[in-house]
């Protein structure tokens, strides 16, 4: 049992816990470490000798784990994949726009066109027809009246107690500020694009090693939606990509060998997602909308080499990871008239899952990575749980729209809390 306390240096005590390790694995590793200490020179000899001074089997095993690989190579892909699906969802989310319009009287459409103002009678006729269509008034003017620009953002903080990777846990934050524009395509269709800035961080803690990552990225994509004229159901989707720069610090806390390794890497990510649902009236201007959403996300990180930690520096190979994120849920929203403005509170909940696809493994090498492995690692974890949302949208006269919401996700070994906000402006 590696769940023991280790005095790293005066005043610094760490829990060496990396799980349960067999005595046979430890004995085989010690034999090879002795051989390395006898044949190696320089810093490799110094580190091997210090590790062999760990008389507690648990402390020895945790020391080998700390010096021979990254702290948790699953934490960064998981965080960025959740962020990519969030960015796509925020971009394509249209709330009441994808529902039938409210039945209360509305102002005539804004006057446009080079041929002069439209007559009141024509405007009222057009408005009457559009009351039967989907509720674009709550996200700007009806699409065939013009284009709409928007600025939206999200931010979330997550924590994970991952038991599959050497007993590590990690905290993460990720934000996004994006701007986009969309317009009508065909009958009842919307097509748009966006670009945004995505900062964040991932901090891994476990055993005798910590790893912190600072993330800065640019994301971009296209999205669209389609609603039949009566608004009984809808279809929406998004395709997003991101280029991310990662600055990394790995702190090793082996007694006698306290080191810090730094590195930088780049990653590309892509996400494909779609959602479809029904609009079920519950009286007045209230609707329940059951929906199904599926997202597929792919992550590819380039290789990198650490510096600053002597023989403990790792040369880490490229990494590829993919995941499916299905959700089944429902939203309830109620449109409330306030003069010519519309206030729409909404709530929602869904069952959701994070299903890793393929092998997420990564190869890391240094003088100690070739030792017999101490098997404390597991595969990337499949997550199941639920998500919730609660917010309000305010549609002002002439199409200006604002919204804000709280969003949370509660999954096995992971909790994520955050929010969304945005503004949409017709032009």
Predicted features and spans:
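Solvent-exposed flexible segments
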Residues: 240, 276, 280, 288, ...
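Extracellular/surface-exposed low-complexity segments
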Residues: 1-83, 93
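Short, structured loop/turn "capping" segments at alpha-beta junctions
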Residues: 283-289, 299-303, 338-344
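Extended hydrophobic secondary-structure segments that form protein cores and membrane-embedded regions
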Residues: 149-150, 237-239, 290-294, 345-349
